[in-house]
Amino acid sequence: MSRHEGVSCDACLKGNFRGRRYKCLICYDYDLCASCYESGATTTRHTTDHPMQCILTRVDFDLYYGGEAFSVEQPQSFTCPYCGKMGYTETSLQEHVTSEHAETSTEVICPICAALPGGDPNHVTDDFAAHLTLEHRAPRDLDESSGVRHVRRMFHPGRGLGGPRARRSNMHFTSSSTGGLSSSQSSYSPSNREAMDPIAELLSQLSGVRRSAGGQLNSSGPSASQLQQLQMQLQLERQHAQAARQQLETARNATRRTNTSSVTTTITQSTATTNTANTESSQQTIQNSQFLLTRLNDPKMSETERQSMESERADRSLFVQELLLSTLVREESSSSDEDERGEMADFGAMGCVDIMPLDVALENLNLKESNKGNEPPPPPL
């Protein structure tokens, strides 16, 4: 391919540009075309002192290195992201970083990941030496075949190795980076006709797919374990919450029981106090009544007072007796008066003179005088 497909210059904003591509190893996702890099384009975050990794298209690589005979293990040229020195291979870059920048902890972008197919073009790491030893060791996986290993080492984004086989349509394939970041698509072809054949390419593709699937499984493994840990934590929290609720309920029940017992005890105490008060009051009243009786029974009056009281009582008794006798005598006298009047009437009938008592005669005289006063005067003569 003659273009950096999917990549745009961050200075002139030209997309899918031709020529050399310069990727900053300090700034995240920052690419420049050749003209902007040579003119010294800078921004607020990017300066000309930042190390840049040069990436070529396949056409430019064939143009620059087409006449040279490269072995299978011929490395690419990488730039140190710390000091900016160029021309390192994978092994020499690892040796340089471990010897010169072992204690440096600045966050940089791995130039090898940006150049390898399927790698992260913006992989940021703060321990570049450990990243190189873990991810970009010189002896590749031993379980892979030599052809597959050669394909992995010779594949490079934006580059292709020379030879007439590189231009055959059935011997190259395209790859693109993921994540929406700056990427490049290019065709790949082997350098030796004997070493590489279509079966080896298919095997290399299958191994790449297996590696990507294994990486995804490895990346998803801790997430599943984290989910399990979270579930266990949630279950423990729920158990703790239930235990706390049970403790609260037991405490509430205990407080309610104590309150009811205290209420009953207070009621019994109040009833006992009222009963005791009532008994005390009744005892006091009994004692008071006893005291009154004793006071009445006690002889406190003098002899003269007693004699006067006895005389008064005797007089009263005599008066009552006289009243009773007088009433009885009046009834007998009234009956005797009626008998005498009957006898006087009998005497009158016999022609005897009626003898009036004096009070009756006086009453008759008074009646006659009053009648005379009430009579009208006689008519004049």
UniProtKB/Swiss-Prot annotation:
InterPro entries: Di19_Zn-bd (IPR008598), KCMF1/Dystrophin (IPR050774), Znf_C2H2_type (IPR013087), Znf_ZZ (IPR000433), Znf_ZZ_sf (IPR043145). A zinc finger (C2H2-type) spans 78-101. Pfam families: zf-Di19, ZZ. The modification Phosphoserine is found at residues 2, 169, 189, 212, 335-336. Zn(2+) 1 binds at residues 9, 12, 33, 36. Residues 154-193, 250-314, 329-348 are annotated as: Disordered. Residues 297-314 have a biased composition (Basic and acidic residues). It is found in: Cytoplasm; Late endosome; Lysosome. It is an enzyme of class 2 (transferase). Pathway: Protein modification; protein ubiquitination. PROSITE patterns: ZF_ZZ_1, ZF_ZZ_2, ZINC_FINGER_C2H2_2. Its EC number is 2.3.2.27. The modification N-acetylserine is found at residue 2. GO terms for biological process: negative regulation of HRI-mediated signaling; protein K63-linked ubiquitination; synaptic signaling. Residues 175-191, 250-285 have a biased composition (Low complexity). The keyword Phosphoprotein applies. One of its GO terms (cellular component) is synapse. GO terms for molecular function: transferase activity; zinc ion binding. E3 ubiquitin-protein ligase which accepts ubiquitin from an E2 ubiquitin-conjugating enzyme and then transfers it to targeted substrates, promoting their degradation by the proteasome. Together with UBR4, component of the N-end rule pathway: ubiquitinates proteins bearing specific N-terminal residues that are destabilizing according to the N-end rule, leading to their degradation. Does not ubiquitinate proteins that are acetylated at the N-terminus. Belongs to the KCMF1 family. Component of the SIFI complex, composed of KCMF1, UBR4 and calmodulin (CALM1, CALM2 or CALM3). This is E3 ubiquitin-protein ligase KCMF1.
